[in-house]
Structure formats: structure tokens, C-alpha cells
């Protein structure tokens, strides 16, 4: 009987993990890449790669709503922040929740794309956060480069 109660409590605790991920991600480890293509073309390619990768766009906004940076002041007035929906990846005993913020900024002869990534892996009484995923971001940038015609 004690084993059944102990196992029941363990299962109950494992099911009570909640995750809070804000829509806006701070620049803990941003990835940036410059594409020698027009702003509209790069923005369309970025949205297409997001959709093809299984990400849903939560909303788009002006980045100055959240922060004012030298990059946004240097842009030619064309910049956008794309906020993704949380993406859940199921593991054996837990799930991982990831989110992206993507900035697209028009520069003089190019367009800069900045990706902020956050993954949260909750377990009972602890949450592990990661701000890096080099292979995912490099693949994402390569797909944008393929669509706009440069790397």
C-alpha cells in the first residue's frame, strides 16, 4: 500500500510542472547574419522557413516596443520582430518547450536577421534553460540564404 501511495505521489508531482516562457526573449545569446538581399525578400524567406520548419508565428511587432538598440537606430526604418508560438517536443519522461524571436532589419545594402532562441526543459522542482542551438540556427540561416540566393 505504501508503494502505491509513493508511486501515485511521484506521478502527481511529475504532472504538476508548469512552464513560463515570455513572448519576448532577452539577448542572452543572439545569432546574427547579414544577407545581401532586399528587406521584403528576406522577410518573406524568413517567414517561409519558419512555416516549413513547423513553427507558428504568434505575432509581429516593431522591435522598439521592447528595446531600443543601435542596430534599430541604424536600420532604414524597416525592421520587424517576429514572435513564435511555443513549440513542445515530447521526451520520454518530460517535454521541452522552445521559442524563437526573429528580428529582420533593413541595412544600407543588405538585411540583417537576428535569431534569439530559448529552450526550457522542466522537471519537478527545477527548470533547465538553454539559449543556444547552433545546428538549428545554422540550418535556419542556410535555408534563408538558399531562398534569397546568397549564403
Where are these regions (language model features)?
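Sec-dependent N-terminal signal peptides
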Residues: 4-13
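Ser/Thr-rich, low-complexity intrinsically disordered terminal regions
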Residues: 17-151
